[in-house]
Regions:
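Conserved nucleotide-sensing/catalytic segment adjacent to the nucleotide-binding pocket
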Residues: 48-109
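Hydrophobic anchor at the beta1->P-loop junction of P-loop NTPases
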Residues: 24-26
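Extreme N-terminal, non-catalytic leader segments
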Residues: 1-22
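A glycine- and Lys/Arg-enriched "phosphate-lid" helix/loop adjacent to the NTP-binding pocket
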Residues: 95-106, 120-167
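NTP-dependent small-molecule kinase module
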Residues: 167-205
């Protein structure tokens, strides 16, 4: 019931208030719950009011013009976009897997703040936080479940071996602008994120 109350509240905010474009960035480790969170948060929203961007491994041409690529995927006025991973992939997943060069990585660290400010949109950022033990348990459930085994890939097991390194990488970019949400209990995490999102939207100028 509490979740439905917050879902209805988000719908009301987006329907009844004029606003600049809103970016809702969801970052987190593999299995943290980014996709399922977006499904829950958007469940009752008017499809004309929002869109979802799923980030996958980028092409070489996209890698070379990383921030320019994302500039074309910003929300319009009175629109909200949910990002299942985002431009911050450069500093985390890409860096972790060696997909970007040292120069590309350092360039992102130097420019991403000013780039965000230049977009003319509100950016609300969430880190979905899970422990190493919880990530391991979720990967095992994914691997063994007849409903989710198809999602399992070698990247999932690699994620466990890179847990500490990912922690270091995310700490280089996650600052006071971010909302860190405990996702060890995913259902409670979704509620906390949605409640935080609604409060943040209500306080936007």
């Amino acid at each position: 019931m509490k979740l439905k109350t917050e879902q209805a509240k988000l719908n009301s905010i987006l329907e009844n208030r004029a606003h600049r474009g809103i970016c809702v960035v969801l970052e987190g480790r593999d299995t943290a719950g980014k996709s399922s969170t977006i499904r829950e948060v958007t469940h009752y929203l008017n499809p004309q009011k929002y869109s979802v961007h799923l980030s996958r491994k980028p092409s070489r041409s996209t890698m070379k013009k990383w921030l320019a690529y994302w500039s074309k995927r910003m929300p319009a006025v009175n629109q909200i976009v949910f990002y299942d991973r985002s431009w911050y992939s450069r500093a985390m997943v890409q860096r972790l897997n060696g997909w970007c060069s040292e120069r590309q990585y350092q360039n992102f660290l130097a420019k991403h703040k000013s780039w965000e400010q230049s977009q003319g949109v509100h950016v609300i950022k969430f880190w979905l936080s899970i422990s190493e033990d919880e990530q391991r348990a979720r990967i095992e459930r994914r691997k063994k479940s007849p409903l989710t085994y198809w999602k399992f890939s070698p990247n999932d097991e690699n994620a466990l071996s890179y847990y500490d390194r990912m922690t270091l990488l995310k700490e280089r970019v996650i600052d006071s602008d971010w909302h860190i949400i405990d996702y060890n209990d995913k259902r409670q995490g979704i509620y906390s994120l949605l409640e935080t999102l609604n409060t943040t939207l209500e306080n936007l100028e």
